[in-house]
């Protein structure tokens, strides 16, 4: 089955890992029909959107803009048609704007930082430099323009709208709850027989306003997963050519401290990835 790619673009998206994650779930012995999907670090949503489980989807994220976007699809505010109309209009303004498009990018960025529109969120996600998502200490979008004033060509708009349609279909198919809250609160929703998927921010790597991560956070996550009665899958990074993840040895290699319902996926960051 083809992986559904969500409209939100971000570095580190787990699209290529979805088949691997789902294979772990298939082999876990979990009740695929009735188990609920619990995801406290939803991010772009690519893993949860492609979950093979048939129960409820209860997901959270510390970034309110991610949650607002998905709730806007759920409520019908964001549709393939409304997104197309928005991107066609803003794309034309971007192409005609001064400073090779930067004037309009700045306008949308300033507007988003005040109004938090889910449409502007996708515009910035797609027109920002190198597919990055970063917020400053005030919680404002903090990524420069990709310097492509013709970014929203007709074929690219269609691609994004098709992604909105695919996500809309999955949201209508299942019972979804999207919440802007702490990872601990989301994990507490899990019950015996459910599946928790965790892809937390990476300790020791770049953080921003919404995805800071400390050793204390790592310890809290470890204890929450240790104590849950649900199954869970954890994906994290192991090392690159510059450093290794100290939290692996400190917490996650201690499998005897956990229980039989765990599947840990250690994702090796390649040497070409930046810190």
Q: What are these model-derived regions, one by one?
A:
Residues 39-41, 60-61, 179-181, 198-200, ...:
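Short His-Asn-centered micro-motif
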Residues 206-212:
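Glycine/threonine-rich flexible loop motifs
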Residues 2-24, 30-32, 77-197, 201-206, ...:
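SAM-dependent nucleic-acid methyltransferase catalytic core
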Residues 214-275:
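Long, positively charged, glycine-interspersed low-complexity recognition regions
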Residues 70, 122, 232:
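A residue-level signal for conserved active-site and pocket-lining positions in enzyme catalytic cores
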Residues 18, 32-92:
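Conserved S-adenosyl-L-methionine
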Residues 54, 125, 173-174, 227-229:
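Structured helix-beta-strand junction loops
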